[in-house]
């Protein structure tokens, strides 16, 4: 009956009031103050139990659906990175792959999703923050956790919050000098050690100083916080290439699927990160407070990698000895070879990447309490962010005689004969193969001003009304070299010949002219000694880093071996030209207005409070670019050609385009809370939100292409060509006319707070999404030379889908004070999230086969995925969404000892359908209705892309600290205690096949801190 009365009361309240909110965005948490709770930026100084109490108070007293993590002390968040901290929050998952590159791991995570969706807004102290590149989101791995006082995750933000997050909003909080009673000092130092990267310690340290003074001009406060850290780890990685169909090679003429081979590599990763934060406060009177803050995060990321990479082009010639196959015909074990072509083509490459990034934030906040009713707050912010990088890859080549693989275990097993091991270690078997460089320079700048006004009512129901305005100008400029990744062969097998542009032979290392610049890579302790791989010859680190000088030397070998001197083109480095394909300039202006009413019915049997609000946002974007068309050079002509008139003739085109886009969004919100008693409460929240496309999706650059459809009969001079028409297609790099994705979010929660650090909460949520950005088809009209208009079918991003994500969250935490005395101090935290989702295209693209030529087939590949036999997949889940997520932690805190063991697990999720490593252009067409059916000579025209998944992954971390004095403590932290391997699988029609295995090994950190 109690729960029935609660439901009735909640329903009556929802009908009677229509309102909702969360009031932290103006730097205060009024609901928390009303209840006597600390503000969201309160400093907690008494261990992990007190930190949990503080976070629980924020959640319990907030006007919104929020989860928080509070630092035990300044600079003492419970993990080594912001992304790892966020992954402990119920409903939040962390991506462990490098951003946009599932072929590499991000040691501390590259991004997060909230409730399965990546539309996350990021803020620093309630202000929008971002990293250069996308322009709308902050790379959390760039932010030093040592500078943070807490992290809040708002899952259904209200009208007064800055727009931008459909799945949620993450607010990073730093301390202010008035948060402390007087002087505060803290010094922390640590040393990290990676079990895979032996002999490479990584020191870190941070220092905070804060004080406040009373003067004749009012009270002043100053705070300085500096953090510097080094990260040195190693990633060991193994890969199995996609499986290709060998038609009729199995028993009774069945098809066998055989991979091109297997690969391995090892990466040494270094990062230096520096964070600086300063805050100054002035309170000239009790009614006026001003705060000036400066925040800067900068880092240098450098990694060096040696990899043995498969480059086999004649997969159809590969043979298997002693083969073991699955019932579907997929290769499981055996020895792979390519005797018809002298061995399996492999490259041994040395790749280095050096990226430098920085983000600066200047902010000024002035709050004036005009009288007991009126409060006015003005806030000014300037953000500047930039990043630039060099990615350099130099490779040698070798023909591997054979490769013996066993893929029946948890990870691949390699077996090499003594002769194969000796062959790989001999430099004379290698030649200089290729170079590839990529450079980028990205910057973003924002100026923002907002004014918030609050009027407090003297009324038993109406508490206050808030309204305000926010203006922002955001500019972004992204520049890349063109071509973006400038792959250039040095001496490739297909270069060998006697004609113009050919070489007489390859530049083998056995030739004294070409012998320098290599070393033997031995892969010591690979996968912690669990996997044995042979040594191989690689270019040195110095050769890879000495761009462009080393590149010029290597490509000189091509000139030295030129069969016809003067006909071999010189190497040209990639440069930052004004080519519009390499430049993306975006200007964005936003004008936002909001109003929000807070209320409370405290006299009801079950008190109800909440807020209702509306936010209006106008967004104006300006971008410029080009539409480009280059006429084909091989149009059929001559007396043996019929139907040539069916091919329209277009002139070359490079048309500058300028776009200005305006869109208006009205974002209502409602938050209600019903208090059943002092411990049990219920919430209902509904809001509309938006997420703007990032700058990369808005690039205004479209390339148009024309290809001829024809059939041929006869041979030689008797060949007769019949032209049947032309394919008019195009590719849009971005779409400057994109609108924001919008969503309507609904939350219903039950929250039981049975102790200061004890709670059991349950949430049901639903998010309906509209205008999801996906690749789709649209027409571009172009006149031919005769003035006739023709439509090119262009593939590019558009607002072409809708969908939903719904599910439940359960969270529990408690310290067990009722247990016998010898067990006191033990506590646990646990959470579980279940998400269901679906995405539906507005104009579905789905066919059983992909042919890789027409635009519709390319779109089929990009959305549904295509196998190496050209069958499509379809019915794929939302990218990056794990259906289940689990967190569990055991804590102990008593006397001077404090420990924690924390386990984080997420279920399988889709990484993408057209990723490097699981895509290509050399599939075979087994579509029986296709004109290229089983045409092995045309296989290089068939594009494929396999759905790539990360399998379920769980990681155990731990820490133990000892408090020697109230001011000094020392401790040990550990990550990945169970040495868990990250596994990726690729889906093919013959099964879910292993593609990649990654390990970083356990990491340990010794830490000492002193407060003064």
Please report, for each region that a protein language model flagged, where it lies by residue.
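Outer-membrane beta-barrel signature, preferentially recognizing the C-terminal barrel domain
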Residues: 353-359, 586, 690-761, 767-769, ...
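C-terminal beta-signal and adjacent terminal beta-strands/loops
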Residues: 484, 489, 904-925, 936, ...
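Extracytoplasmic beta-strand/coil segments of soluble accessory domains associated
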Residues: 83-128
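Gram-negative outer-membrane beta-barrel transporters
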Residues: 766-768, 773-778, 785-915, 978
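Short acidic/polar hinge/loop motifs at secondary-structure boundaries
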Residues: 111-112, 127-155, 207
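Transmembrane beta-barrel wall of Gram-negative outer-membrane proteins
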Residues: 198-334, 354-365, 370, 670
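N-terminal periplasmic "start-of-domain" segments of outer-membrane beta-barrel proteins
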Residues: 44-80
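Short loop/turn motifs that connect adjacent beta-strands in outer-membrane beta-barrel proteins
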Residues: 161, 177-183, 214-220, 287, ...
């Amino acid at each position: 009956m109690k729960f029935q009365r609660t439901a009735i009361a909640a329903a009556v309240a929802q009908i009677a009031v229509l309102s909702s909110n969360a009031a932290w965005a103006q730097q205060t948490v009024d609901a928390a103050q009303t209840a006597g709770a600390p503000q969201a930026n309160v400093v907690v100084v008494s261990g992990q139990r007190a930190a949990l109490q503080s976070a629980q108070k924020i959640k319990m007293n907030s006007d919104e659906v929020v989860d928080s993590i509070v630092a035990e002390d300044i600079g003492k968040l419970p993990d080594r990175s912001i992304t790892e901290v966020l992954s402990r929050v119920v409903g939040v998952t962390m991506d462990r792959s490098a951003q946009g590159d599932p072929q590499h791991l991000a040691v501390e995570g590259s991004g997060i999703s909230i409730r399965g969706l990546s539309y996350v807004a990021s803020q620093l102290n309630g202000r929008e923050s971002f990293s250069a590149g996308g322009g709308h989101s902050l790379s959390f791995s760039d932010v030093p956790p040592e500078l943070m006082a807490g992290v809040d995750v708002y899952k259904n933000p209200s009208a007064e919050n800055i727009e931008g997050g459909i799945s949620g909003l993450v607010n990073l909080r730093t301390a202010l000098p008035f948060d402390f009673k007087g002087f505060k000092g803290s010094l922390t130092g640590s040393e990290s050690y990676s079990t895979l990267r032996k002999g490479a310690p990584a020191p870190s340290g941070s220092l905070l100083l804060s004080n406040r003074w009373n003067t004749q001009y009012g009270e002043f406060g100053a705070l300085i916080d500096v953090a510097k850290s080094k990260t040195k780890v190693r990633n060991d990685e193994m890969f199995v290439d996609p499986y290709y169909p060998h038609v009729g090679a199995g028993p009774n003429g069945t098809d066998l699927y055989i991979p091109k081979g297997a690969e391995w590599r090892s990466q040494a990763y270094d990062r230096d990160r520096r964070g600086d934060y300063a805050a100054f406060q002035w309170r000239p009177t009790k009614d006026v407070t001003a705060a000036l803050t400066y925040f800067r995060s900068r880092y240098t990321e450098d990694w060096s990698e040696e990899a043995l990479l498969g480059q086999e082009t004649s997969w159809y010639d590969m043979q298997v000895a002693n083969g073991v196959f699955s019932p579907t015909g997929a290769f499981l074990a055996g020895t792979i070879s390519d005797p018809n072509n002298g061995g399996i083509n492999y490259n041994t490459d040395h790749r280095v990447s050096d990226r430098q990034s920085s983000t600066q934030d200047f902010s000024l906040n002035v709050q004036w309490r005009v009288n007991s009713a009126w409060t006015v707050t003005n806030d000014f912010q300037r953000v500047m962010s930039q990043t630039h990088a060099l990615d350099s890859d130099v490779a040698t080549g070798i023909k591997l005689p054979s490769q013996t693989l066993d893929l029946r275990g948890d990870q691949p097993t390699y077996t090499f004969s003594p002769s194969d091991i000796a062959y790989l270690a001999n430099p004379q078997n290698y030649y200089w193969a290729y170079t590839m460089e990529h450079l980028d320079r990205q910057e973003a700048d924002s100026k923002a001003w907002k004014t918030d006004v609050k009027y407090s009512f003297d009324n038993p129901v109406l508490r206050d009304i808030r309204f305000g305005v926010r203006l922002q100008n955001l500019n972004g400029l992204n520049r890349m070299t063109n071509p973006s990744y400038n792959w250039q062969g040095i001496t490739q097998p297909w270069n060998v010949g006697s004609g113009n542009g050919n070489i007489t032979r390859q530049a083998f290392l056995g030739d004294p002219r070409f012998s320098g610049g290599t070393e033997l890579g031995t892969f010591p302790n690979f996968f912690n000694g669990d996997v044995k791989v042979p040594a191989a010859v690689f270019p040195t680190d110095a050769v890879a880093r000495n761009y462009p000088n080393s590149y010029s030397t290597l490509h000189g070998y091509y000139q030295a071996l030129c069969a016809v001197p003067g006909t071999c083109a010189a190497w040209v480095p990639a440069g930052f030209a004004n080519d519009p394909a390499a430049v993306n300039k975006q200007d964005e202006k936003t004008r936002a207005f909001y109003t929000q009413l807070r209320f409370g019915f405290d006299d009801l049997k079950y008190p109800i409070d909440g807020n209702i609000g509306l936010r209006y946002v106008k967004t104006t974007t300006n971008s410029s670019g080009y539409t480009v068309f280059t006429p084909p050079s091989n149009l059929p002509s001559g007396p043996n050609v019929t139907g040539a008139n069916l091919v329209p003739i277009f002139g070359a085109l490079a048309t500058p385009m300028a776009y200005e886009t305006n869109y208006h969004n009205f974002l209502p919100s409602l938050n209600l809370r019903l208090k059943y008693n002092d411990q049990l409460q219920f919430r209902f929240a509904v809001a509309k939100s938006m997420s703007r496309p990032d700058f990369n999706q808005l690039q205004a650059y479209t390339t148009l292409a024309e290809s001829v459809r024809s059939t041929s009969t006869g041979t030689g001079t008797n060949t007769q060509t019949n032209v049947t028409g032309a394919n008019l297609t195009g590719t849009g790099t971005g779409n400057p006319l994109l609108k924001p994705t919008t969503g309507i979010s609904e939350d219903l929660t039950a929250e039981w707070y049975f102790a200061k650090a004890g709670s059991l909460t349950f949430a049901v949520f639903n998010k309906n999404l509209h205008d999801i950005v996906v690749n789709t088809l649209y027409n571009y009209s172009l006149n031919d030379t005769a003035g006739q208009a023709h439509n090119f079918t262009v593939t590019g991003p558009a607002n072409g889908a809708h969908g939903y994500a719904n599910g439940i969250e359960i969270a529990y935490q408690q310290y067990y004070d009722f247990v016998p005395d010898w067990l006191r101090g033990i506590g646990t935290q646990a959470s579980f999230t279940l998400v269901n989702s679906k995405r539906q295209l507005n104009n579905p693209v789905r066919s059983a086969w992909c042919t890789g030529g027409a635009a519709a087939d390319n779109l089929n590949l990009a959305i549904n995925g295509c196998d190496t036999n050209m069958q499509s997949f379809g019915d794929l889940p939302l990218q990056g969404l794990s259906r289940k997520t689990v967190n569990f932690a055991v804590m102990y805190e008593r006397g001077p000892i404090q420990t924690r063991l924390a386990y984080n697990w997420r279920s399988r999720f889709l990484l993408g359908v057209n990723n490097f490593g699981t895509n290509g252009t050399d599939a075979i067409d087994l579509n029986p209705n296709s004109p290229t059916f089983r045409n092995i000579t045309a296989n290089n025209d068939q594009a494929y892309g396999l759905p790539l998944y990360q399998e379920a992954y769980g990681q155990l971390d731990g820490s133990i600290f000892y408090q020697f004095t109230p001011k000094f403590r020392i401790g040990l932290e550990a990550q990945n205690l169970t040495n868990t391997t990250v596994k990726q699988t690729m889906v093919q029609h013959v099964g879910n096949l292993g593609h990649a295995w990654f390990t970083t090994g356990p990491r340990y950190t010794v830490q000492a801190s002193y407060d003064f």
